[in-house]
Swiss-Prot record:
Disruption phenotype: Increased accumulation of methylthiooctyl glucosinolates in seeds. The keyword Oxidoreductase applies. This is Flavin-containing monooxygenase FMO GS-OX5. GO terms for molecular function: 8-methylthiopropyl glucosinolate S-oxygenase activity; flavin adenine dinucleotide binding; monooxygenase activity; N,N-dimethylaniline monooxygenase activity; NADP binding. The gene is FMOGS-OX5. Coiled coil: none annotated. Catalyzes the conversion of methylthioalkyl glucosinolates into methylsulfinylalkyl glucosinolates. Specific for 8-methylthiooctyl (8-MTO) glucosinolates.
Amino acid sequence: MAPARTRVNSLNVAVIGAGAAGLVAARELRRENHTVVVFERDSKVGGLWVYTPNSEPDPLSLDPNRTIVHSSVYDSLRTNLPRECMGYRDFPFVPRPEDDESRDSRRYPSHREVLAYLEDFAREFKLVEMVRFKTEVVLVEPEDKKWRVQSKNSDGISKDEIFDAVVVCNGHYTEPRVAHVPGIDSWPGKQIHSHNYRVPDQFKDQVVVVIGNFASGADISRDITGVAKEVHIASRSNPSKTYSKLPGSNNLWLHSMIESVHEDGTIVFQNGKVVQADTIVHCTGYKYHFPFLNTNGYITVEDNCVGPLYEHVFPPALAPGLSFIGLPWMTLQFFMFELQSKWVAAALSGRVTLPSEEKMMEDVTAYYAKREAFGQPKRYTHRLGGGQVDYLNWIAEQIGAPPGEQWRYQEINGGYYRLATQSDTFRDKWDDDHLIVEAYEDFLRQKLISSLPSQLLES
């Protein structure tokens, strides 16, 4: 579906969050001539990518009254995907400037480089002027076909405002999910969620069990092998007989999921192996969490399914006045944020027409039924994975944008394959240099960069 008509509306829009999703949402909304206020509880842009050495006093982050630390970034974190495919389409994630030694020019750079990229993006498009820093949104609710937004700044001063629309970009890496294992409530050792992991020092000479073997699980388990006595990874995606020593370390083992844990400190795996452990690290993901949102029960979060949402973005009965950017995972995040933001901005201006509420609900119901028929758990509702190409290209079609570049999709597929097959070396060894060249030639052709990087010219 191509854009339906020329722009007709200029609205007052609240954006919640100034991370990677909120920044590009603000830019696209302003491009559609909307007036934008971005609410950000931190003192700077970047959201998830703003590192702090601080962690929460409750290591599992289960206490609802705890002091919340919003970052989940650990000190050694590097990106899981190549930088070429990570960035926004018209602001590529290339080293800026090339000769600045304070920047990380690696293909899989550190979290500090990602934050610097987002700061560059905000500076380039003059987005900071739209942001209210140190301001937390405490309530969002519909009011007379508009939206009431109540916020509170760091001085404790509250403010009530009315907006035509609200775009939720608050991220989903703050409210941890923990593993449910028989006996774990009475297990005597220490437990911590990856949300509160920063550096490995606390695990010196310990036997550590890490639950989860994707992204943070793979990273953290290898990060602590340098100080821990033993590290054992448990994963429910592994067959029940799984037991192997992983390459690249002499004290790292991969297991099937935990069968049970016991008051004497032992942990029994489904493969029959028994370990006497000191600490369990839960690398088990996060919950979608919108404590400020009151829709009178229309929007619910059940087993990590946020709904009902049309194409993961619009609640049919409240669209386009309420929208969500960035819920899907296992995808090209920044690129998806950009496409979703363009769609939301165009729908609010009237340049793109959404289907009727009834048709959107039909599509939501059909999507849920399809996933259930394939036996996919509800908690995977927003997991794109192999469906991301169709999803991203579909949104691009709605706004009249070209589909995603083939090199971009090939890079993410290759990146996930290397992550799964060479978790100890995937960030520093690859076999797709031709895709790097293709990406940079594309940037050059679009005049997004002025020249090819020196390392490409030398190759």
